[in-house]
Amino acid sequence: MVSPEAVPYAKTGGLADVAGALPLELAKLGHDVRLIIPRYRCIDEPLHMFRRVTDVPVPTDDGPIRAVVEQEQAPSLSIKLTGRVSAFAIRHDPFFGRAGLYQEEGRDYPDNLERFSFFCRGVLALLARFDSAEQWKPDILHLHDWQTALCAVYLKTLYAKQREFAGLKTVLTLHNVGYQGQFPKAQFEKTGLPATLFTPDGLEFYGSVNLLKGGILFADLLTTVSPTYSREILTPEYGFGLEG
């Protein structure tokens, strides 16, 4: 389970409630779940006690950067009662050690594309580390909204031939299609993807980069938060340009 926010760690909206509750419900059904989020500054350290367990190299436009992977050492009561859920966080303070999750004083961080490209590649680096250590190998990577959508794109492109990800399927849940992760064309290179993907059949969207569009195109399965919303986003009123 990969989410940009999750209760009880960090929250700006309803996405966090879903991403926090769903792993627990899946665990009740007998699934072994790992939740991976960014290590934000707002996470209550005394309460959750995230501690370093390893480092992973994350490719970036400026060369590889080592991200710290932390695991929660004092799980919440709900997780303790359910079991079979572990929470991990990708830590890189220049990106995630800020006052807000996505913005400050009503203004989006201008490097959000770079921040969440880093997060997505950090997630995949962690999964590869799990596999190489024979610790854990997921069957499904469940992604939430535009901030995690690049995981699906990377797995079908840059990471398509890596044995660690053989058989891994992706599910992308759309919580609010109004937020698509759109950025100027000049930032596309920060994704590390080939220029051939910046086309109308790829991540290009009216001259801009659209991360949610990429996730929709490359994920193995799409879900929404309700049957009603799944129908609404197929209309111009709620599809925000992606209804076609």
Predicted regions and their residues:
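Catalytic cores of nucleotide-sugar-dependent glycosyltransferases that transfer UDP/GDP/TDP-activated
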Residues: 1-244
